[in-house]
Regions:
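Targeting-peptide/extracellular-domain and disordered-appendage signature
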Residues: 2-13, 22-178
Length: 178
């Protein structure tokens, strides 16, 4: 069990490192995007529910949900669901549907504190062809068969399953947005 935990922990650290490296490399050449992407400013007024969705005028955004789950037999698990949308420096003016303008990255993690085990999976794809997207307006992000959607009543639907574990959740917020 410890070997599996160490292997998963190493993969998780490598994923986070790869994500930061990718963002660092992609931000080195900002000149192509500087005229179209907006800076993030502290006084930007948010208007909900429209601002729950994607903002293609900004470089990077993410939808992040964490929490604790309890089974019927009182076993507890921690979970994390994250979707990222990243505007690339590539093909902005290219009208082709094949042009990679945005990348969607998704990460799913489930922790079992009773045995010190962390399971996680990740996926990455460019937006397009209904395989990966981040919708403007209300939350709607998808990568392959994984998705996070906010319904009109405010409930979030999550479906992220892999070959060995996964989550299907219906979540109702109990607090206002931060």
């Amino acid at each position: 069990m410890k070997q599996s935990y160490k292997k998963n922990k190493k993969r998780f650290v490598m994923l986070i490192g790869l994500l930061f490296l990718m963002i660092s490399v992609m931000t080195v050449n900002d000149s192509a995007l500087s005229s179209r992407l907006l800076p993030v400013l502290p006084d930007h007024l948010l208007v909900f529910p429209n601002d729950y969705g994607a903002h293609p005028d900004f470089r990077l955004e993410w939808w992040y949900i964490t929490g604790w789950l309890e089974t019927d037999d009182k076993k507890k698990f921690g979970f994390q669901v994250t979707f990222f949308r990243y505007a690339t420096d590539l093909n902005f003016g290219n009208p082709s549907r094949f042009a990679a303008k945005d990348v969607v990255i998704a990460h799913l993690a489930l922790s079992d504190p009773a045995v010190g085990r962390l399971m996680h999976r990740e996926k990455t794809a460019r937006e397009g062809f209904d395989l990966a997207y981040s919708k403007q307006g209300n939350t709607g992000v998808k990568l392959d068969d994984w998705f996070l959607v906010r319904e009109e009543n405010g409930t979030y639907q999550v479906d992220m399953r892999s070959e060995d574990f996964g989550l299907q959740l219906s979540l109702r917020p109990t607090q206002k947005p931060m």
